[in-house]
Amino acid sequence: MLYLSEVMMKNHDMSSFEELKQALKGEARQGQMFFEMDVKPQFDDTPTDWQDQCEAAFTSRD
């Protein structure tokens, strides 16, 4: 199980929500199958629908 907090710790130099979405896509491409959102991203550009966007980024893998 991949946790959002793990992705954020592994990529601690991220400065935007868009970078987080790219990191999630990368994790999915590497074979991660399950994803849990255990924290809310605290970026200035984090949208109100951040959970939907994180899920979409993880499942799209594009």
Residue ranges and their predicted role:
Residues M1-D62:
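Metal-dependent phosphodiesterase/phospholipase catalytic core, i.e.
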